Amino acid sequence: MTKNFIVTLKKNTPDVEAKKFLDSVHHAGGSIVHEFDIIKGYTIKVPDVLHLNKLKEKHNDVIENVEEDKEVHTN
């Protein structure tokens, strides 16, 4: 089941390393849904959590945070 995740890269991540991460997303059968302007981050869609875990292992040195993209409600 495909899911969207918000992935934030570390501030000092070189553009070449960010490109390698994005290439890995595509290679894993995923896609880039959105690229953030203010921070070095992306919303990605991946086929399953296993693919996400492989991306996290491969690019652990540049990934700051990963969280599922879902609705947030306030009361």
Curated annotation (Swiss-Prot):
Q: Give its localization.
A: Cytoplasm
Among InterPro entries, the record links this protein to:
PBI_I9 (IPR052471), S8pro/Inhibitor_I9_sf (IPR037045)
Stored Gene3D superfamilies: Peptidase S8 propeptide/proteinase inhibitor I9
Keyword list (alphabetical) reads:
Cytoplasm, Phosphoprotein, Protease inhibitor, Protein transport, Serine protease inhibitor, Transport
One of the record's GO molecular function terms? serine-type endopeptidase inhibitor activity
Q: Taking the first listed entry, what is the main subcellular location of this protein, grouped into a coarse class? A: cytoplasm
Q: Which GO terms describe its cellular component?
A: cytoplasm; cytosol; fungal-type vacuole; membrane fusion priming complex; nucleus
**SUPFAM superfamilies referenced in this protein's UniProt entry, alphabetically:** Protease propeptides/inhibitors
**Modified residue annotations for Phosphothreonine:** 74
Q: Where is the signal peptide?
A: none
What is one Gene Ontology biological process annotated in the Swiss-Prot or TrEMBL record?
vacuole fusion, non-autophagic
Subunit composition and interactions: Part of the heterodimeric LMA1 complex together with the thioredoxin II/TRX2. LMA1 binds to the ATPase SEC18.
UniProt record similarity statement: Belongs to the protease inhibitor I9 family.
Miscellaneous comment as given in the Swiss-Prot or TrEMBL entry: Originally, 2 inhibitors of protease B, inhibitor I(B)2 and inhibitor I(B)1, have been isolated from commercial baker's yeast, which consists of both S.cerevisiae and S.carlsbergensis. It has been shown that S.cerevisiae only produces inhibitor 2, and S.carlsbergensis only produces inhibitor 1. A sequence for inhibitor 1 from S.carlsbergensis has been determined (AC P0CT05).
- UniProt function note: Cytosolic inhibitor of vacuolar proteinase B (yscB), probably regulating protease B activity during limited proteolysis. PBI2 is a component of the LMA1 complex, which is involved in the facilitation of vesicle fusion such as homotypic vacuole and ER-derived COPII vesicle fusion with the Golgi.
Annotated protein name in UniProt: Protease B inhibitor 2
What is the organism of origin for this protein?
Saccharomyces cerevisiae (strain ATCC 204508 / S288c) (Baker's yeast)
What taxonomic ancestry is recorded? Answer: Eukaryota, Fungi, Dikarya, Ascomycota, Saccharomycotina
